[in-house]
Regions:
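Glycine-rich beta-alpha junction loops
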Residues: 40, 122-124, 196-201, 236, ...
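N-terminal helix-loop segment corresponding to the beta1-alpha1 unit
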Residues: 1-187, 281, 292, 329, ...
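Short, well-structured beta-strand/strand-turn elements
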Residues: 33, 299-313, 412-415, 691-705, ...
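Helix N-cap/coil-helix junction residues
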Residues: 103, 258, 320, 491, ...
Length: 787
């Protein structure tokens, strides 16, 4: 049994989380990675207790410690690169080191033509912001990730450095996509330019599209409404109860004995007096219910609910425990538990974790057998051309995967029915303004570009038989329902492999295909809640907070990475396989630090709000209404610049602020100084003044301003597409540019319901009369029933 990426050779010149997580995913899939470190080592070695996070991100890699300032050190690195397939680096955009170290494109083409190079930076290698100073907080602020999560509190960032893992996931996706292009461009370096800023934008639920829609209807463009109930306190802890449809809300009201609030969902979501009245009556009932009982009751009613797991409780969660997801790692005397691989491949499973490299690693590293590089007839602009994808996805996670494949050339056929269309069509259903409302929802459109659409009633014999015929001809089948859904139709892997032995099937259940909770309802919010993402987000003295949805595209990215590895395995061996991506395991994989830290210290770290462990920073109200600025003071030079901007040079050498440690010790007083000045200026003015002096700062981004960003314009992040009903709209692209590679992000707008029925079914050999009969029997159709 070989690994999916057996023979793939990767050199990593990266630190902290994003680049190491990118290559960690490749290691999980069987690639061989050499991590290059300078003598001082990756700073992550000293982050947190026992270096556990470094061990997690760098397990199984070879180590090469060199002084890149010396010619002998560079020669060693160049020797490794000359034999590699992929180089992953995270040097700042425009860094002089890239040229001095011979890592620029021209130098690399002399060393290794045909190399894939993944360059990770904050804003990308080009554009007016490419050299702008930033920190994880200010990047989150710029991308709309710092927002109001708790009524009455300042907007707050996502915790536990989750966004950095997201960037690493996209970098792995870029690497494997560029690898397919390199089979066409064998004598050229293929570069993937990954923007962390764009990666964070790419995981948002299309707020720029929603803002345009709300404005067109005369409504405020930046809605702060969040699904009810959200995260609430029960008898013995926090629980997430998530009403993502109108039926969920009615069921929750009935469950709590409060049916009179069934007609007031929107008013309660928006925080009016109805909200206070509702919770005054709901909280006593919640206080009487243990979390476990409330989760079980809610799930029995098909209401998405989950406990709020932290680094301790997640280890005792029945679903994770039954699936043996957390594994032992670390050296003797410092053992800890960490997440396992975030995907399971039936024919090429990930092995047990191996140790991370020690600093001062071997002078030479011997690669194992290299990868065979067969020439491809594909076009570099469409690296997935010829790939047939049968898309049984619903909502966001699976649809995000198939949208990506279709963008770069795959023929994706999405299956819905006029009786039960993709539930994403109902997202934003409160905005119904025409008979075709189900065709124009921002979330539906954004996740279903680049596809063809057929409708098949799978409850009918004729519809199910046609689905099986489509699956029999597919290279890849994708689904992300609860496990029992495709199994009851006989469309699971064991059934499909009998009619299509080489098929690769990707299953993306919320909770996994096995375990006591496998049939629980899994939506993004309760995935975030169960996996620890919510527990680390928010203020120390407040409740855990939802991230509002990124778990879906994060799972989609990880599933795509696993699929591309499986396609590489099939290229070499002809063998298909089943890929299982349990979304709760992806969530835990990108929230690794809390469980690692707890298992090393037996302590659960408090939520950190907007603070950082090593320097002072925060989010502050500016003079405008609901206008906020985020800033970080990384060092004494930043602090000196801040004192000049706020007109308090006397504070530069104040003992309370004279060093990073002093500023952390007096963070409350630091906040007061910044807040007092921020309240007198617009957020944009304050941020620009700080940026002009080299201090990381950003005005908090909102949906209605996301189309007006010079950096995104310069990099062509948005793309206009004409929809037959919605007209021309601008859609976000993917957070990387591959050169040589695709010149466009998307190939076609989202399809209308059943738009390609005649085309797809005709290709199966059905006559026009047979197709007409199917339409008369409502096996297929082009209009939603009971709309």
């Amino acid at each position: 049994m070989s690994d999916a990426l057996a023979g793939l050779r990767v050199v990593e010149i990266g630190e902290q989380i994003a680049a190491p997580y990118c290559t960690k995913l490749l290691v999980d899939l069987g690639a061989e990675v050499v991590k290059v470190e300078r003598p001082a080592g990756d700073p992550l070695r000293s982050w947190g207790p026992g270096g556990g996070l470094f061990e997690y991100l760098n397990a199984g890699k070879h180590g090469l410690t060199v002084d890149l300032g010396m010619s002998s050190g560079l020669a060693q690195v160049h020797e490794m690169i000359a034999q590699a397939d992929v180089l992953v680096e995270d040097l700042p955009a425009g860094s002089a080191d890239r040229f001095e170290w011979g890592l620029d494109r021209e130098a690399l083409e002399r060393i290794n033509p045909g190399l894939v190079v993944v360059r990770i930076s904050d804003y990308g290698q080009e554009g007016p912001r490419r050299a702008q100073p930033s920190t994880p907080l200010t990047l989150q602020a710029a991308a709309g990730w710092v927002n109001t999560r708790e009524f009455g509190r300042a907007p707050v960032q996502a915790g536990a450095r989750i966004p950095e893992y997201i960037v690493g996931g996209y970098a792995a996706l870029a690497a494997l996509t560029a690898l397919r292009i390199s089979t066409v461009e064998q004598d050229r370096v293929v570069e993937a330019d990954v923007s962390a800023f764009e990666a964070l934008l790419s995981t948002l639920p299309y707020p720029m599209l929603l803002a345009e829609r709300l404005k067109s209807m005369g409504l405020p463009p930046n809605s702060k409404a969040a699904p009810m109930l959200g995260i609430v306190r029960a008898a013995d802890g926090w629980i997430g109860i998530n009403c993502l449809t109108g039926q969920h809300w009615l069921d929750v009201c009935a469950m709590m004995g409060l049916p009179e609030f069934g007609e007031h969902q929107l008013a309660i979501m928006l925080g009016g007096p109805e909200r206070d009245e509702f919770f005054a009556k709901a909280q006593p009932w919640l206080d009487s219910m243990p979390v476990a009982d409330l989760v079980e009751l809610s799930q029995a009613m098909r209401i998405p609910a989950a406990p709020i797991n932290d680094g301790s409780s997640i280890l005792d969660c029945p679903q994770y425990r039954d699936r043996d997801f957390f594994v032992d790692a670390g050296p003797e005397g410092a053992r800890f538990q960490r997440p396992g691989a975030p995907f399971r491949l039936s024919k090429t499973p990930a092995g047990a974790p191996r140790p991370a490299p020690l600093l001062g690693g071997a002078d030479t590293v011997q690669w194992s057998t290299g990868r065979e590089r067969d020439a491809s007839e594909a076009d570099a602009a469409t690296p997935f051309a010829g790939l047939k994808v049968f898309d049984l996805s619903t909502f966001w996670a699976g649809a995000y995967l198939t949208c990506y494949l279709g963008a770069f050339g795959a023929d994706v056929v999405k299956v819905e029915s006029i009786q039960r269309p993709d539930g994403h069509r109902y997202s934003g259903s409160l905005l119904r303004s025409s008979d075709d409302w189900y065709e124009v929802g921002p979330l539906w459109q954004g996740t279903n570009l680049n596809k063809r659409d057929v409708t098949l009633d799978l409850s009918s014999d004729a519809g199910l038989e046609l689905a099986r015929r489509l699956a029999a001809d597919a290279d890849v089948v994708i689904e992300n329902f609860s496990p029992r859904v495709v199994e009851q139709f006989g469309l699971d892997y064991d059934s499909l492999v009998k009619i299509n032995p080489g098929v690769i099937m990707v299953r993306m259940p919320g909770f996994g295909l096995e375990g006591p909770w496998r049939d629980y309802v899994g939506w993004a919010l309760n995935i975030e809640q169960l996996s620890g993402m919510s527990a680390v987000t928010g203020y120390a003295d407040g409740p855990p907070c939802n991230l509002q949805g990124p778990a879906d595209p994060i799972a989609g990215v990880h599933a795509t990475v696993a699929l591309l590895a499986a396609l590489e395995h099939r290229r070499r061996t002809g063998e298909g396989q089943l890929i299982e991506v349990a979304q709760i395991e992806v969530g835990a994989a990108v929230t690794a630090e809390p469980v690692i830290e707890y298992s090393l210290t037996q302590r659960v770290r408090e939520r950190e709000g907007n603070r950082h462990r090593h320097y002072a920073q925060g989010v502050y109200a500016a003079a405008g209404e609901d206008d906020w600025v985020a800033l970080s003071v990384r060092d004494d030079a930043d602090w000196a610049a801040v004192t000049e901007v706020v007109g308090r040079p006397d504070l530069r050498d104040d003992p309370k602020f004279v060093s990073a440690d002093a500023r952390l010790a007096h963070h409350g007083e630091f906040d007061e100084v910044i807040a007092e000045y921020a309240a007198t200026r617009s957020a944009e003015e304050f941020a620009e003044a700080l940026l002009g002096r080299g201090v990381p700062a950003q005005r908090l981004m909102t949906g209605d301003r996301m189309y007006d960003v010079d950096q995104l314009d310069a990099r062509g992040f948005y793309e206009d597409l004409d929809h037959r009903i919605a007209g021309r709209q601008r859609f976000p692209g993917w957070p990387f540019r591959i050169t040589p590679g695709p010149s466009r992000h998307h190939r076609s707008p989202s399809p209308t319901l059943g738009q390609h029925n005649d085309e797809v079914l005709g290709a199966l050999g059905l006559t026009p009369d047979e197709i007409s009969t199917l339409r008369e029997r409502r096996v297929i159709g082009e209009r939603l029933l009971n709309a």
